[in-house]
Amino acid sequence: MRLLVLLTALLTAGPLAAEPVDFTLENLDGEAVSLSDFRGKWVIVNYWATWCPPCLEEIPDLVQLYEDNRDTLVVLGVDFEEVNTEYLREFVDSHFMTYPVVRSEPLPVTPLGPVLGLPTTYIISPEGERVARQEGPVTREAIETYLERKRGEAGDPAAKSADAASP
């Protein structure tokens, strides 16, 4: 039932922006990471925190989603709390978070829209447009179902390039 509610929320989310959005935050090595660095791929922007139980529950699904779809999408974790970098790096390593993680410090940065609770996830199209938003946990299955639907609607350039690269 929870999956059905989540899937419905993602599927019924209308376009959130008609033009590309961008932001730049620092990763755990202090390097700048911009949303526009990932143009041409779907981006799953996930606001989370180490103290948030629902955030921790969705990490394995997000890792698997990222690992299985690196050619067509990226998961970008945005840590939405004030903790020191070494603690955060150890946390990320201990939870096998292989996708990029950036910090929303020094101030909470929410350029995609409101973050009223954690986790909050935005889906960004390969063109850089916000196409969906979900408050609460997401699952790999719900995201994949949503992306399959969106790819079928619009002739997704990321899907086309992945198809061209396939044998």
What is each model feature region?
Residues 155-167:
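Non-globular targeting/processing and membrane-anchoring segments
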Residues 20-21, 43, 118-119:
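Short loop/turn microsegments at loop-to-beta-strand junctions
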